[in-house]
Design a protein with these regions (language model features):
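N-terminal pre-catalytic "stem/leader" segment of glycosyltransferase-like enzymes
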Residues: 1-75
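Short, solvent-exposed loop/turn segments at secondary-structure junctions
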Residues: 8-11, 40-41, 71-74, 100-103, ...
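A generic structural motif
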Residues: 29-35, 91, 186-189
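Extended catalytic core of nucleotide-activated donor transferases of GT-like folds
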Residues: 44-121, 127-131
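Short active-site oxyanion
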Residues: 121-125, 166-169
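Donor nucleotide-sugar binding/catalytic pocket of nucleotide-sugar-dependent glycosyltransferases
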Residues: 123-137, 141-159
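Conserved donor-binding/catalytic core segment of Leloir-type glycosyltransferases
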Residues: 160-190
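Conserved small/polar residues in nucleotide/adenosyl-binding loops
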Residues: 197-200
Length: 200
């Protein structure tokens, strides 16, 4: 069983940056990229779009998991065709990673009804916030297993090993001797209740 994660090419802005960051994080966990391409699919016949989808999912095997990043930047028709093809593989699970409300975007072809129809075809959800889940549930999204990804990790190339003035802040009645950090050049700063009020 493999885990695939979608990434749409030929889009920019926040969607493109976010999808790339999530895809990169997924690859560090061994996920495989499932590449989508933004284009005016209205010019493709259904048969032509089916051929494109066959190429997109060529590496998919039965029982695989696909994490679909929503919004994808594609049209409802394109995404619907993708879900249809994913469902052709026995046991394939679709996890919809819902990062924002597509129908609220000025550049989106989606209506809220389109979103609910598509997302209800997924097996599981990952939401960027609990409020996002509440909104979709209130508007017709089915109750299914889900995760809330409250605080994402952001990939960075910045080395954090050489910070100066390292400090460990504690709020407890304790002795600095209990923290043998002097040999690591880390200062222990203790806050009592009075000191803490100055921080808030």
């Amino acid at each position: 069983m493999s885990v695939h994660i979608t990434k749409t090419y030929n889009i920019g802005g926040l969607i493109g940056l976010r999808q790339n960051a999530v895809k990169n994080a997924g690859e560090t966990l061994g996920f495989k990229e499932m590449s989508l391409f933004k284009f005016p699919d209205a010019y493709d016949s259904d048969d032509e779009l089916h051929v494109r989808m066959d190429g997109i999912i060529a590496s998919l095997c039965p029982e695989d998991i696909v994490i679909f990043q929503h919004p994808s930047g594609e049209s409802p028709r394109y995404d619907g065709f993708l879900f249809e093809h994913l469902r052709r593989y026995h046991g394939t699970k679709i996890v919809a990673f819902i990062q924002e409300i597509a129908s609220d975007r000025d550049d989106s072809e989606y209506s809220l009804r389109d979103e609910i129809t598509l997302l209800n075809r997924a097996d599981m959800f990952i939401f960027a916030s609990a409020a996002l889940r509440d909104y979709y549930i209130a508007n017709g999204l089915k109750e299914k297993p889900y995760l809330i990804q409250n605080i994402p990790d952001y990939m960075t190339d910045i080395c954090a090993n050489e910070h100066k003035n390292k400090k460990l802040y504690i709020m407890a009645e304790t002795s600095q001797n209990e923290y043998p950090l002097n040999n690591l050049n880390i200062e222990v700063v203790q806050y009592d209740a009075v000191s803490y009020t100055h921080l808030t």
